[in-house]
Regions:
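Membrane-proximal basic amphipathic "stem/tether" segments
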Residues: 1-43, 270-284
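Class I SAM-dependent methyltransferase Rossmann-like catalytic core
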Residues: 32-84
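Conserved class I S-adenosyl-L-methionine
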Residues: 85-95
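Class I SAM-dependent methyltransferase SAM/SAH-binding core
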Residues: 93-139
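A short SAM/SAH-binding and catalytic strip from SAM-dependent methyltransferases
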Residues: 151-165
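A short, conserved alpha-helix within the catalytic core of class I
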Residues: 161-176
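Conserved beta-strand signature within the Rossmann-like core of class I S-adenosyl-L-methionine
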Residues: 177-196
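Short alpha-helix
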Residues: 204-229
């Protein structure tokens, strides 16, 4: 009987909303029109925001790295794009998580520069890691403009936490980067909104964006979608079932001065078809 009661939608949502929210990493609460509203709601909690060393300290060098199948598209496109002197701008790259992980699986040619744009707490810890690991090709900054001249922009699991949307971030650079790799981003078919997410004892704003809106915003900048991938992974917003997302997406875009018009219509579906024709090393 007790299990049946907790299985009912209303009781289940109430349990997630008020009982488990602060104690369950990744739990979400509320729907807000923009980042400012969500941030204001987060401020009602004793601990809020991302600028805390607690979020970055666990990224310790030397621990075993276990790749997941979802990460292989990123490895593939990076391996196809890296060449001598390539500059990578890693948006929200924590304390170098992607750098330390990916370099164990793909070759970094001479002169590759990996720049992480992050909050001060991540930058401080990341600089320490770069020093102790003797990684002169890894640097950190709180200034997005320090990424000027980037050949690749990589954002993996961080786009949903950044106040500005991706086109706005890209326009702050002196020139649009030729390649974009987007990974682990929650998207759905409804209207873009923000919610609050519980993360290691803190509460932070969290964006869930309309899938086609994200793609179209980059196509309008002149990018061409080459690949798209997704995984089934849920973000549940209690009391707002229509706002919940059940998939995280990844994309590979290239800047195209003369885009083929066929890429402008149903871009995501087109990329999915192209993906079937690409022989990835993990698809055997």
């Amino acid at each position: 009987m007790r299990n049946a009661i907790f299985a009912t939608p209303l009781v289940s949502d109430f349990f997630r909303q008020y009982w488990r929210f602060l104690w369950r990493v990744g739990a979400c609460r509320g729907v807000y029109a923009n980042y400012r509203e969500a941030s204001k709601a987060c401020a009602a909690f004793k601990k809020h925001g991302y600028n805390d060393a607690l979020f970055y300290g666990p990224a310790i060098i030397g621990e075993p790295v276990h790749m997941r199948k979802r990460d292989y598209p990123v490895l593939y496109w990076l391996s196809q794009s890296l060449k001598e002197g390539t500059r990578i701008l890693n948006l929200g790259g924590n304390a170098g998580t992607e750098y330390f992980t990916y370099r164990q699986f793909i070759h970094f040619p001479d002169g590759v520069r990996w720049i992480v744009w992050e909050l001060p707490a991540a930058v401080n810890f990341g600089q320490h890691l770069a020093q102790v690991s003797k990684s002169p090709d890894l640097s950190f900054t709180t200034r997005l403009e320090d990424g000027d001249g980037a050949d690749i922009v990589l954002v993996a699991g961080a786009l949903q936490y950044i106040e500005e949307d991706l086109p706005t971030c890209l326009k702050r650079l002196s020139a649009l980067p030729p390649r974009l790799v987007i990974h682990r981003t929650p998207l759905y078919e409804g209207e873009t909104f923000f919610t609050m997410q519980s993360t290691y004892g803190s509460v932070v704003p969290y964006r869930i964006q309309n899938r086609q809106e994200l793609a179209d915003s980059l196509l309008k900048l002149g990018y061409r979608m080459v690949d798209c991938w997704c995984e089934q992974r849920s973000v549940i917003i209690p009391f707002y079932p229509a706002r919940s997302s059940d998939r995280f997406y990844g994309f590979y875009f290239v800047l195209d001065d003369s885009p083929d018009p066929t890429w402008k219509t149903d871009a995501i579906e087109t990329a999915m078809e192209v993906r079937k024709q690409i022989r990835h090393p993990w698809s055997n």
